[in-house]
């Protein structure tokens, strides 16, 4: 298995006015191409990460989270990395990463409910507790 992450541009220029004609369609097309290349290379399963914060505006990131279920058609696990991201700081108007816990938990919860299978976190205990609550909710 391998994790493949979407990025628009390169780390040097990715945040310089990122533009998309159709955000989700471009991300899906990217992963279809990656899956084909991975298969040719003998990698049978990839985990996809839409790359929150990598060549995307806050609005793009929120659109991805809102439409995460669109990626289910790729029939592969979806990983999301939102933990402490600057987008949370921008939404909450704070530069302090210690003020991003609630935003991380909220967006992780929404992401899992919208189709994410894996959440990448800095705060493992809070992440596990969030997952347990989501599991209990789904089983109710």
Q: Model segments located where?
A:
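Active-site-adjacent loop and "lid" segments of alpha/beta metabolic enzymes
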Residues: 1-40, 55-140
């Amino acid at each position: 298995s391998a994790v493949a992450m979407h990025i628009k541009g390169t780390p040097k220029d990715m945040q310089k006015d990122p533009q998309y004609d159709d955000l989700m369609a471009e991300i899906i097309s990217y992963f279809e191409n990656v899956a084909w290349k991975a298969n040719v290379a003998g990698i049978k399963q990839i985990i996809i990460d839409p790359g929150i914060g990598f060549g995307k505006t806050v609005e793009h990131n929120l659109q991805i989270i809102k439409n995460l279920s669109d990626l289910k058609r790729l029939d592969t696990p979806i990983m999301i990395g939102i933990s402490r991201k600057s987008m949370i700081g921008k939404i909450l108007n704070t530069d302090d990463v210690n003020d991003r816990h609630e935003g991380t938990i909220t967006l992780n919860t929404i992401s899992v409910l919208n189709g994410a299978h894996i959440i990448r976190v800095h705060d493992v205990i809070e992440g596990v507790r969030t997952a347990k609550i989501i599991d209990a909710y789904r089983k109710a």
